[in-house]
Amino acid sequence: MVSRSWLAALLAVGHLSSICRAQVDVPSVNNFRRRVFARGKHRPTSLSKDTQGISNECSASVIGDWVYYDGGEVSQVISGLSPQSQWRPSNPTNTTLSIDLTKSWTPEDVEIKETSKSAPKMMRQAIFTDNSSNSFYIWGGFTSYGAKIPDAKLWHFTPDGSGGGQWGTVLPHGNTAFTALTRSQGGAFVSTKDSGFYFGGFADSGSDPNPNGPVPGFLQFNYTATDTAWTNNSDSVPYSDYGTLVGATAHYAPYGPNGLIMIFGGGSHVIGTGQSVDNVGYLSFSTIYFMDPVTKVWYTQQTSGNAPGPRMWHCTVGVQGPNSTYEIFMYGGSNIANKETFDEVYILSLPGFVWQKANYTSAAPRDTQSCVVAGQRQMITFGGVNRMANNANSTLFFNEEDSFRQGVGVFDLTALAWKDAYEPTAAAYDSPDIVKAWYNEG
């Protein structure tokens, strides 16, 4: 005879198993709660007049007419149970997601396509987009809920042009150097014309078999190298006394013969094991550090205007203006020291290096979201949580229903306003009025 305690245990196991099976990567609109750490990149189909100068360095990979998102976690109502009532409040995303950018849609009715994947399920990994092959790679990140760290392999996704694609591993030239790299999470990553760059990061027990805390310097992955594709540049960098960086964004701006990689925000840690990922010294947005990706020479520029306050886990995108300006848009983020999550959009306009802030009422603070530019002048945001409103308690912030339906937001970069729908045929981008006014004033 089975005792009551054993019977209860068996029933509980069966219930948990059914909940696990019911978990999906794209919940219904009403069951969806939150999504975090989904990463990707946007690349226009071609450098036409409508898309030239668009750069997205902290979000999903737009290749052709689709934006791809990979990795992260999702929370949802399952069998009537809220996330905080389940055995864990979120679950890793098991598929690669994509959205069609040729169709009009609202966040509530947008179709999010799923593609099965053999690649590891990681959080905060880097995505490097190779424009020459219309494909992307993933590197680094951490596993959630104590899952086994995967072997050191370079995973590659080749889209099929219809929102799907194929995953596989590649053996980079100089593979010994690649496998010897410390695998970290939360670094700033960016793609240039021929390389992917990864700055800083934090090696913990979920990212590397031999975790050693904050990682200084930066990595370069040359897509076309015939000898050693991966190089570790551990020399000093100017943005931090320790050379470390976590929770920042890196942005590639098309200035000069080689372009420039710019670092925005984030925090820096003392080197060594035992450091907390939250114990950081914040980088200021009033000073911008940028590097020539070919010569590796660093430059520094002071900004003017209304600079953002210190923060981590924001996102950035950039668009070429019609009058030889280039605007970089920074959205969201959080400051653990001040216990604040932000719903703010700031604009840094080049060559003036002036900050402006979009004037709208904050309604949906979030960090760890992705953002891309699509439809010429629209920023699409994906995911994010209000971490500080819930004291960084994941059970609470995963339980909170997102005011962005399916976690998707649409922001007009010219009008500086949130929109109810995405329009692929929106008017061409023009610099916001507050940016044009600054230049007109001389």
Please tell me what each predicted stretch does.
Residues 79-80, 148, 166, 208, ...:
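Intrinsically disordered, low-complexity regions enriched in proline, serine, glycine
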Residues 23-49, 58-115, 140-168, 222-225:
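Beta-propeller domains
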Residues 4-21:
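Cleavable N-terminal signal peptides of Sec/SRP-targeted secreted and luminal proteins
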Residues 91-94, 131, 222, 232, ...:
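N-linked glycosylation sites
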Residues 40-48, 105-116, 157-179, 219-241, ...:
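Blade-edge beta-strand/turn elements of extracellular beta-propeller
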Residues 73-91, 139-151, 201-213, 263-282, ...:
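Short, conserved, GDST-rich strand-edge loop motifs in beta-rich repeat architectures
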Residues 84-104, 149-163, 209-227, 276-296, ...:
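Beta-propeller blade signature
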Residues 49-70, 74-76, 115-137, 154, ...:
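Conserved short beta-strand element of beta-propeller blades
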